[in-house]
Swiss-Prot record:
Residues engaged in binding Zn(2+) 4: 1017, 1095, 1097
Organism: Xenopus tropicalis (Western clawed frog)
Primary location group: nucleus
EC number of this enzyme: 1.14.11.80
Function summary: Dioxygenase that catalyzes the conversion of the modified genomic base 5-methylcytosine (5mC) into 5-hydroxymethylcytosine (5hmC) and plays a key role in epigenetic chromatin reprogramming during embryonic development. Conversion of 5mC into 5hmC probably constitutes the first step in cytosine demethylation. Selectively binds to the promoter region of target genes and contributes to regulate the expression of numerous developmental genes, including pax6, rax, sox9 and six3. May also contribute to the regulation of target genes in ways that do not require its enzyme activity.
Composition bias, Basic and acidic residues: 1291-1325, 1465-1474
Binding of Zn(2+) 2, residues: 77, 80, 83, 93, 1204
Name of the protein: Methylcytosine dioxygenase tet3
Binding site for 2-oxoglutarate: 1085, 1198, 1240, 1795-1797
Annotated GO CC locations: chromosome; nucleus
GO biological process terms, semicolon-separated: chromosomal 5-methylcytosine DNA demethylation, oxidation pathway; eye development; positive regulation of gene expression via chromosomal CpG island demethylation
UniProt domain comment: Binds target DNA that contains at least one unmethylated cytosine via the CXXC-type zinc-finger domain.
Length: 1901
């Protein structure tokens, strides 16, 4: 492996923020980044050289390049970890980190004494990586040897690799070395893998070693040796020299002399680590990373130098290897590599760096975590490393320690090592992981690696510093140096008969190492290994050392590590045996079998990992799942402060990190290898399926990014492993969850061992292979230190697992072997009491055997969770184990079920308790049925609260203990934020592209006190206006109280004054106004009213009142999705009726506007824009716009609509609303305030007293110039409703209730002839001439009733439809459907029944069947025909030929009914009919009837009575208010006092109710109108006048409300009543009609009066009325009420166009516009015209009410900042979070709006393709199935469900209702005829039925 001094970017951080908190780690990292040459990639000489160069680099702080994008970035992103944790993090924003600084400094290290061959800066060459499988054990030996003596190129290569890794870590990119390492790791074992394995092993070992050192140093917290001394200065000078030389790429040069004594170097290192930097150090931060790295490398070099003696530091292993006929060169290379890797690169894997940065933990901790991860993930490969295994462990005792802790801390980070390499070296890695676990540094490294989250091979990952450090470590007895340990290991290796047979050496070594492993893991697996070299003693010492070591300073730790070389050697021996065993597991079945024996022994020593290897392969995955996060977290934090740091980051990790280990870590390679030993075939199968399955499962269960790792095991797993590690470490609490996942993974592995290849790939990609190999060696060395540390950690983890799974829950060692086919693993778990938990020993092996599990939770291997995982793996491998893992896969779901049997072998019920939450006997089916049962509570909590992810995760800070939005206001940053107002200006200038006056910043202060009028309506206290044309952009910013962080100032509103071109705005204003005014369907919005629902801010005139129209996709609560879920051809811009052209035009306008607004939105608020387009591809159907980049799903057009203070709660949580404003022509000039304008208000804010620059004078200047308009209390007109507007729900309930009552009454009438008789008696009064008309009427009724009724019905529905609320619904039953609508409450009102007369005691008069022989009924229709041709045209056109007969009958009847009573009744009825005819298409005809009535009042009278009934019927649909309004108008206008009196007397109280609902008496009155018209002609004439609302309309207008309580109407009613003999009838109907008329007349604001006025004229234009019959129904009824007002009928017809009927004037124009407005009652007043009328009456009173809202101005803290949007402006705000409103206009007129607000928004849930049709269909299918089931059940029970459904639906449904009673009533239709002629009862029942039906019967009548 030739050293390629590729230029490495300067590693030294320009900004402290660029590097992890652990400067030492950084330094090491940088060293690792440097080429092997720089790192001293070989012997101590190289290290020294590198040290020389490093000092040079560190002396000179690298500067930011100033040209890259990050350097040019001025503002911190505010979202990265460094920004979020600004108070604790000393690193610069990641987005601002210089690209050059990210790159590691190129430190060419020429003089690599030990490793003459340099390694590529970016890692070993592909050929190097691919040269062969890496024998981690051998590599470990070689590294140790290399540290001590070998100047082999392997060391250089390792150094280079380390540098590459460091570089890659720093750059967050995998070093080129990864693929190679992966390849090497992928290969099981190749004896001749010196170079490649060296690099890989070196990487892994370096990582482990460094992690161990880092962990030890961080954990022990060695006190700094002291302040920098002259020696330190000398060292620093030399470091600078070497650094500079490294940068230059040459090691040449005269390095300043410096003491190279190991103790001196250690002391300097300790000092440097504790913040003592040389005087000339210019590095940011407490430590000089480069210097630390250099020192470590120097130490390593020194150690290596001492070892370089033939085998001084190679130690026993190297010597033994050489003595044992190992090629010296190979041994040296291996040792060099080992030493190199641990010394420099190990600490600075990208994963560790990333972890350190992201988790805000020290680099040491991160490295330790990473090392643990890699160790756990990189299991020793028995075959690959068997020959060299003994050497490597011995070689890299320190490295192993480092790696081992790192594995312990970060099993996930282990993945960074190339997965291939890991797989190749899994066994070694496994050993390493176990051995490394104790080492505290490794966790640091792991953490760091995790932070980097980039897959790197261990070699790449390990900085050159690690190699030096490894050399240093070996030199120190305390730290099991590779040489010593290697020697010991080599002694064991002697047992290993040849380097090619590392298994033998491992077995020999395992004699002692087993004991160590046991002690560390406390698992049964470790017990078998107790036999090994010095395991127990070493372990104990290691524990102690680990504890002490953690307490020691880094230097002390290093020294101690060096001192404990013996222990480490023993440990290495054990670990090597363990690794060897694992290698066997991973080796071919034969090899695995051979290794199994050996591995059992060495596995025992490395039982922490070794037993895990076999047992872990399957169980490891489970462990990973359960414990990865928890175990790692717990273990890492517990062992050392780094872990604590990880814990600190846990919450974040929990948020963003998956509970499970990274996929790479979760890889099943270890498992697979174990199975390979047992069953390679099985492993192959499992590997193929398990890794993906496991990953999938993990992804599913933990929502981890396992998919990536699955897809690319090498790269993704590595990355994922690191990420997972970070997440897991940060989320130790999740470790248990992850452990569960790990168990599952283990189950997968056990079940499917095919995943091994992928697992290997994963490990390779993660770079864990090398690390694993190195870790294996390291773990052997750390067996003592690391094992001791790990032992403590593992004990903690074990306790955790015991708490979860039970202390005794452990798999017997044999259990694992049974699965693995390895007796030793079984023995180990069973034999080693330490492995009580199923995972302890298995954890590490699973890491090796099951990379996913291991990678997922390296900590698990170290933790009880790891042990438990190991035990689980054992269970997996052996049915004996109480927790056997069962792997079931179905598609992408793989369920690893651990049979939590309290089996004898598993021994302890305690093991099960851990899984108490899990199903006792998990299965795939069980998982599919209830996946949550398989998750631990923390995992469930994560899954159960995904909504939080949906919530904006805004940056946090430490400015305040807890953000209290009530005090500081809503907190969000997606509009923009910064530390100061000036930063906001810079930000907006950058976005907008202009500076200076073009951008205006206004500060506002959040008060939390809402400014509103006394009525609760919006007001403004300050108005921000555009100052000049130069001002292009205005931003409102809020200073967050108590904050001084990066997000102390946030943007709350952005106003682009020229958002769209002026020409576009003008055309849009015209087009939208014309289209929407005519065809728009207003939307009822809660914000249109105040809290009391009593304000009339939208205006009192329904024809001009402000309205809101919705277009595009919106949420439907019915569909629980987009309202177009069922629409095959959605009409997003639907208008009333069929108007495709208008809809297309509107669509084009809005789509084009959305397309043009989106870029502006993107420019001004890029983050919010991006949030809204994230799901564009998925839900493109629910998006507006013609081009890519569609942030909006819907648009609301508000035309003079006053929106009361509200928040758009259903908008996208992290999105904004974009409001495009179009203003009237007189409000388009800058600097001129229009007479009437609408403002956008923020009621909770007040204006700051200073401008953006903090100047009060500047603010005053703005006020003077008009930029800020300060308002004061001034009188404002208060528009108030007479009664609170009903909500849609209330209206529906009332409508249903009324319908139910009517139906009930109908039924009663049908059943009881008494009522019918009463009605007939009354009718008799009206029916003075019943004979002919009745007969004729019968046939006519028979024929026409359905048609006419349908017409009427349509009319009533039409009225309903006219209201936007109603839409196109035209319920047949006014009681049911119409009543549901607020505007059609008339139909639902009791008045309707009373109008029909059947419900009320006066039911007869309306139909006139009883009193008058069908005359009243027929006359209504036929009178329309007979009275006047025009009327005939109306009603007769609809009527059959018999209608003319009816007309003639009516005429005759009218004549016959010459009596006053008949006339009065006729008049009343005619009035009523007129009203009804206005309401109905027939009402137009009935309008004609009134006209006819005028000429022939007598004739009309009988028919008018009928019409009155019709009117009443229509009145039902139109709701009595119409009739009442017309009648009232008539009463006002009518000259016949009798009629008016009768109407008034009974009608006023009756007809006028809240919301115009008529009382039953009102109903009676409605009926009485027949009598009203029945009186004599004069009454009829008066009635004409009465109907002649047009003539009297003005008066009615003025007194429109009075009929509600006005004397005029009363008088008129009184006169009518006096004239009408049948007061009951006349009073009922006449009063209704009179009441209706007066109100309508006076309420010409309501379309009804206008229609009355125009009704007479409209009669002629009945066709028009019919076209919009429903609109004109109410009006036409009113109009019909005034027969004399035919001229007004024409307007009425227009009114029909817009059912807004109530107009100030009956004029056609006003009627037309008003009618539409009338149609739509923004206040739901349409429920009854009476309400509208009464409202208008009160409005007059209210108009006199004024308010100055003085209380708002007395308190300066009451908010009310308003912005005056200009024509074409675009306003952007977070409407979901900010309370906002729009002020009411003085004179709203949506026909010519003062302001049109086009509000573009995106609903939070409109993210389904095809409008969510699939979801809807699924829902419907489910409902259908349920219905079918209910039907089946009902059939079984003999219940008729249909009846029930009919009962409900028909009860409320118009059609259904009609069907049930109406069907019967329809049957009675003939009866009705007969009843009409013959009996009241029969007639009543029939007519009532039709009455209920409302349509057909009424029409015919």
């Amino acid at each position: 492996m030739d050293t390629q001094p590729a230029p490495v970017p300067h590693v030294l951080p320009q900004d402290v923020y660029e590097f992890p908190d652990d400067q030492e780690s950084l330094g090491r990292l940088r060293v690792s980044e440097m080429p092997a040459e720089l790192n001293g990639g070989g012997g101590g000489g190289s290290a020294a050289a590198f040290a020389m160069e490093l000092p040079e680099q560190s002396n000179k702080k690298r500067k930011r390049c100033g040209v890259c994008v990050p350097c040019l970035r001025k503002e911190p992103c505010g979202a990265c970890y460094n920004c979020v944790n600004r108070s604790t993090s000393h690193q610069i924003c990641k987005m601002r980190k210089c690209e050059q600084l990210k790159k590691k400094r190129v430190v060419p290290m020429k003089g690599v004494e030990n490793c003459s061959e340099s390694i590529l800066v970016d890692g070993p060459k592909t050929d190097q990586m691919e040269a062969g499988p890496v024998n981690h054990v051998q590599e470990g030996r070689l590294k140790q040897e290399c540290d001590s003596t070998l100047p082999s190129k392997g060391c250089e290569d390792l150094a280079n690799q380390l540098l590459m890794e460091a570089n890659s870590w720093l750059s967050n990119t995998a070093a080129p070395q990864d693929p190679c390492n992966k390849l090497n790791w992928d290969k099981p074992t190749i004896p001749n893998h010196a170079a490649n394995n060296n690099s890989n092993l070196e990487d892994a070992k370096n990582l482990v070693a460094f992690s161990a050192v880092a962990e030890a140093m961080s954990t022990y917290g060695m006190p700094a040796s002291g302040t920098p001394s002259s020696v330190s200065l000398q060292l620093y000078e030399k470091f600078n020299y070497e650094t500079n030389r490294d940068n230059s790429g040459h090691l040449e040069g005269n390095a300043p002399s410096c003491p190279e004594d190991l103790n001196t170097l250690k002391a300097a290192l300790a000092l440097a680590k504790h913040g003592v930097k040389p005087p000339n150090c210019n590095c940011d931060g407490p430590e000089c990373p480069d210097y630390l790295e250099w020192l470590e490398n120097k130490i390593k070099s020194t150690v290596k130098g001492s070892q370089e003696s033939p085998f001084p530091n190679l130690g026993q292993v190297s010597k033994e290897l050489v003595q044992k006929q190992y090629p010296k060169e190979q041994v040296l290379n291996l040792e060099n590599k080992n030493s190199t890797c641990p010394s420099g690169n190990l600490p600075f894997s990208q994963n560790a760096l990333s972890l350190a940065k992201e988790k805000n933990i020290s680099l040491q901790t991160a490295i330790a975590i990473e090392a643990l991860t890699q160790l756990s993930s990189a299991l020793p490969q028995t075959n690959n490393e068997c020959p060299n295994a003994p050497s490597q462990p011995l070689i890299n005792p320190h490295d192993q320690l480092t790696h081992f802790p790192s594995a312990k801390g970060n099993q996930l980070p282990m993945l960074p090592v190339a997965r291939n390499e890991l797989f190749q070296n899994q066994q070694s890695q496994l050993y390493t992981g176990k051995n490394a676990l104790p080492v505290p540094q490794s966790p640091r490294q792991t953490s760091w690696e995790q932070n980097k989250k980039s897959s790197y091979q261990e070699g790449q990952y390990i900085p050159e510093n690690l190699s030096h450090s490894s050399s240093v470590l070996p030199s120190d007895a305390s730290t099991p140096q590779k040489p010593e340990f290697l020697q010991q290991w080599v002694q064991n290796a002697d047992l290993l008969k040849s380097p090619s047979d590392p298994m033998t050496g491992l077995k020999q070594l395992l004699g002692n190492t087993d004991e160590y492993i046991k002690s560390v893991f406390k698992g049964p697996e470790a017990l078998p290994n107790k036999k090994n070299v010095k395991p127990k003693h070493t372990i104990k010492s290691i524990k102690k050392e680990s504890t002490e070591f953690l307490k020691m300073s880094p230097d002390q730790q290093l020294s101690q590590l060096l001192q404990t070389n013996e222990f480490h050697r023993n440990t290495q021996a054990a670990l090597q045996q363990h690794l060897h065993h694992k290698r066997n597991l991973f080796v071919d079945p034969n090899a695995m079998e051979a290794c199994t024996q050996e591995q059992q022994n060495w596995w025992v020593p490395s039982s922490q990992q070794a037993p895990v290897s076999k047992t872990t392969e399957k169980p490891v995955k489970e462990r990973k799942k359960r414990r990865q996060s928890p175990s790692q977290k717990q273990v890492e934090p517990k062992p050392k402060p780094q872990r604590k740091q990880v814990q600190i980051k846990k919450p974040k990790v929990k948020e963003g990190s998956a509970v499970f280990m990274p996929v790479s870590q979760i890889s099943l390679d270890t498992f697979r290898r174990v199975e390979k030993e047992e069953n390679q075939g099985k492993e192959m199968d499992a590997e193929n399926s398990l890794p993906n399955n496991v990953q999938t499962e993990l992804l599913e269960s933990q929502s981890l990014q396992l998919t990536g790792s699955q897809a690319n095991p090498d790269d993704r797993k590595t990355v994922n492993t690191q990420e997972m590690c970070n997440e897991n470490q940060s989320n130790i609490g999740k470790a248990n969850n992850f452990a569960l996942c790990v168990n599952r993974a283990n189950s997968f592995v056990a079940k499917d061992q095919c995943p091994t290849p992928s697992t290997h790939d994963t490990s390779s990609s993660s770079g864990q292979g090398d690390s694993a190999n190195q870790h294996t060696n390291v773990s052997d060395v750390p067996g003592q230190n690391d094992l001791s540390c790990l032992d403590d950690k593992l004990e903690d983890l074990i306790r955790q697992f015991e708490a979860e799974f039970g202390e005794d829950f452990s798999l017997p060692g044999s259990a694992v072997p049974s699965q693995n086919g390895e007796g030793p693993p079984k023995q180990t778990p069973s034999g080693d009491p330490q492995f009580k938990l199923p995972f302890p020993s298995q954890l590490l092996p699973p890491e090796n055997s099951t990379k996913p599990a291991t990678h997922s939770n390296p900590a698990l291997s170290n933790n009880p969770v790891s042990r438990e995982v190991s035990n689980n793996l054992d269970s997996l491998f052996s049915s004996k184990s109480p927790k056997q893992i069962k792997i079931e896969s179905s598609g992408a779901i793989t369920v690893v079920s651990t049979t939590c049997f309290y089996s004898e072998e598993n021994q302890h019920l305690d093991g099960t308790p851990t899984k108490s939450d899990l199903p006792f006997n998990p299965t795939l089916s069980g998982f599919l049925d209830s996946p949550l049962k398989y998750l631990t509570s923390p995992t469930k909590s994560l899954i159960d609260t995904p909504a939080k992810k949906a919530q904006a995760e805004f940056p946090t800070c430490d400015c305040v203990e807890q953000i209290n939005e009530k005090d500081e206001g809503p907190y969000y940053t997606h509009l923009g934020s910064g530390p100061t107002v000036a930063s906001i200006r810079e930000l907006m200038e950058e976005r907008f592209g202009q500076k200076g006056d073009a951008i205006r910043i206004e500060k506002v202060i959040y008060t939390g006190k809402e400014g509103k009028s006394s009525r609760g309506c919006p007001i403004a206290k300050w108005v921000i206006r555009r100052q000049s044309e130069d001002e292009k952009l205005m931003c409102l910013v809020r200073q967050r109280a108590g904050h001084h962080c990066e997000n102390a100032v946030i943007i709350i509103l952005i106003m682009a004054w020229e958002g769209i071109p002026r020409s576009l705005g003008d055309s849009l204003y015209n087009d939208i106004t014309e289209t929407i005014t005519k065809y728009g369907n207003p939307t009822s919005r809660r914000c249109g009213l105040n809290d009391d629902r009593t304000c009339a801010c939208q205006g009192k005139d329904p024809n001009t009142c402000g309205a809101s129209f919705s277009f595009g996709c919106s949420w439907s609560m019915y569909f629980n999705g987009c309202k177009y879920a069922r629409s095959k051809t959605p009409r997003k811009f639907r208008l009333i009726g069929e108007n495709p052209k208008e809809e297309d035009g509107l669509k084009d306008n809005f789509q084009n506007l959305a397309t043009k607004v989106a870029p502006v939105y993107k420019m001004l608020a890029p983050q919010a824009y991006q949030n809204q387009v994230n799901n564009e591809d998925i839900a493109i159907d629910c998006r507006l716009g013609l081009k890519e980049g569609r942030p909006f799903s819907g648009v609301t057009a508000c035309m003079d609509f006053c929106a009361h203070a509200h928040k758009d709660q259903h908008n996208l949580y992290n999105g904004c609303t974009v409001v495009c404003t179009l203003t009237k022509e007189d409000n388009r000039m800058i600097g001129r305030v229009a007479e009437d304008e609408q403002l956008h208000v923020l009621p909770l804010y007040k204006v700051s007293t200073t401008d953006e620059f903090g100047s009060e004078e500047g603010q005053l200047e703005k006020i003077k110039k008009g930029g800020i308009h300060v308002l004061s209390s001034f009188p404002r007109e208060v528009r108030k409703l007479s009664e609170p507007a009903k909500s849609c729900r209330q209206r529906q309930l009332e409508a249903k209730k009324a319908a139910a009552e009517k139906k009930k009454l109908q039924k009663e009438k049908l059943v009881s002839p008494d009522k019918t008789k009463q009605e007939p008696s009354d009718k008799k009064t009206c029916q003075q001439n019943p004979g002919v008309p009745q007969q004729q009427t019968k046939p006519c009724i028979k024929v026409e009733p359905s048609n006419h009724y349908n017409n009427f019905k349509y009319n009533g529905n039409g009225v309903v439809e006219s209201y936007s609320v109603l839409g196109s619904c035209r319920p047949s039953d006014p009681y049911s459907m119409n009543s549901v609508y607020s505007y059609h409450s008339f139909y639902a009102q009791p008045n309707l029944p009373s109008v029909n007369g059947f419900h009320s005691k006066y039911a007869l008069p309306p139909f006139g069947f009883y009193g008058f022989p069908n005359n009243p009924v027929v006359p209504n229709q036929f009178m329309n025909y007979g009275t006047s041709d025009a009327r005939n045209s109306g009603w007769m056109n609809n009527c059959f030929e018999k209608k003319p007969e009816l007309q003639s009958l009516a005429d005759g009847m009218n004549q016959s009914y010459g009596s006053e009573l008949s006339e009065q009744s006729f008049r009343r009825s005619s009035e009523v009919p007129h009203h009804y005819s206005l309401q109905n298409p027939s009402s137009q005809k009935s309008v004609n009837v009134p006209h006819r009535t005028t000429p022939a009042p007598v004739e009309t009278t009988p028919y008018s009575n009928l019409p009155c009934y019709n009117k009443v019927i229509k009145k039902e649909p139109g709701s009595d208010p119409l009739v009442d309004s017309f009648q009232r108008a008539n009463s006002v206008h009518s000259h016949s006092p009798g009629v008016n009196h009768s109407l008034q007397a009974s009608d006023l109280p009756i007809s006028y109710k809240a919301n115009g609902a008529l009382s039953s008496s009102g109903r009676t009155n409605a009926e009485s109108p027949c009598s009203m018209f029945m009186p004599n002609d004069k009454n009829g004439l008066e009635k004409k006048d009465y109907f002649g609302v047009h003539s009297n309309a003005p008066g009615l207008k003025d007194k429109q409300w009075p009929p509600y309580g006005t004397d005029v109407s009363v008088r008129q009613h009184d006169s009518l009543d006096s004239q009408s003999p049948g007061k009951v009838w006349s009073s009922c109907k006449l009063s209704d009609s009179s009441a209706a008329l007066p109100s309508s007349a006076s309420t010409q604001d309501k379309n009804w009066n206008g229609r009355q006025v125009s009704l007479n004229q409209g009669m002629k234009e009945s066709a028009l009325f019919q076209e919009k019959l429903w609109n004109s129904v109410a009006a036409s009824d009113r109009c019909s009420a005034t027969p004399s007002d035919r001229s007004s009928i024409t307007p009425c017809s227009e009114l029909q166009d817009k059912n807004w009927g109530s107009f100030p004037n009956p004029t056609v124009n006003s009627l037309k516009t008003d009618s539409s407005q009338n149609h739509w009652d923004p206040y739901s007043l349409d429920d009854n015209m009476d309400d509208g009328q009464s409202k208008s009456v009160k409005e007059e009173d209210d108009e006199e009410i004024w308010s100055d809202s003085e209380h708002n101005f007395l308190d300066e803290n009451i908010g009310g900042v308003a912005v005056a949007p200009g024509h074409g402006s675009i306003l952007i705000e977070c409407a979901r979070r900010e309370l906002h409103a729009t002020t009411p206009l003085k004179k709203p007129n949506r026909c010519h709006p003062t302001r049109i607000s086009l509000v573009f928004y995106q609903h939070k849930n409109l993210n389904q393709p095809n409008h969510g049709l699939a979801l809807w269909e699924a829902k419907m299918k489910q409902l259908a199935e349920r219905a079918r089931a209910r039907e089946e059940e009902a059939a079984k029970l003999g219940i008729k469900q249909e009846v029930k459904s009919l009962g409900k639906k028909r009860k409320w449904g118009g059609a259904a209702t009609t069907e049930t009673p109406p069907v019967e009533k329809k049957d009675y239709t003939p009866t009705r005829q007969a009843a009409t002629i013959l009996t009241d009862s029969a007639t009543t029942s029939f007519s009532y039925a039709y009455t209920k039906v409302t349509g057909p019967y009424s029409r015919f009548i």
